[in-house]
Design a protein with these regions (language model features):
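Sec-dependent bacterial lipoprotein signal peptides
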Residues: 1-20
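Solvent-exposed, flexible loop/coil residues
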Residues: 5, 38, 89
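Detector for Asparagine
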Residues: 15-18, 37, 99
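Signal peptide cleavage region of secreted peptide precursors
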Residues: 18-28
Length: 101
C-alpha cells in the first residue's frame, strides 16, 4: 500500500511539470528552442503561456523570464506587454499586443 501511494505521488508531481494551466489546457502547443532551452508556447486570444520543457539550474529568474518572453514573441510575432508578465521559473504567462511592431 505504501509503495502504491509513493508511486501515485511521484506520478502526480511529474505530471504537473509539463502541464499547461487550466486556461490553456485545450490549446495546441507550438514548440520552440531558444539557445539550449525548449518551450511549449500556447496562445489564446491576447494571452500567451510559455512552458519551459527543460531545466535552467542556477539561472536568475529575470533571465529565465526574458527567455520565455522571447519564446512567446517569436512564436506569436507579437510583443509581450511587460506589465502583464506573471509566472514562475517553469511557466510564464503574458498579454500580447500584435499591433505593436
Amino acid at each position: 500500500m505504501t509503495r502504491a501511494l509513493v508511486l501515485l505521488m511521484c506520478l502526480t508531481v511529474m505530471n504537473g511539470c509539463n502541464t499547461p494551466s487550466i486556461g490553456f489546457s485545450q490549446v495546441e502547443p507550438h514548440s520552440i528552442t531558444i539557445g539550449a532551452n525548449t518551450f511549449d508556447v500556447r496562445v489564446k486570444e491576447d494571452r500567451a503561456e510559455a512552458l519551459r520543457m527543460d531545466a535552467m539550474y542556477g539561472t536568475p529568474l529575470a533571465v529565465q523570464t526574458q527567455v520565455a518572453v522571447q519564446a512567446i514573441e517569436e512564436v506569436t510575432g507579437c510583443k509581450v506587454l511587460p506589465q502583464s508578465i506573471t509566472g514562475d521559473p517553469a511557466m510564464v504567462q503574458a498579454t500580447i499586443d500584435c499591433n505593436i511592431s
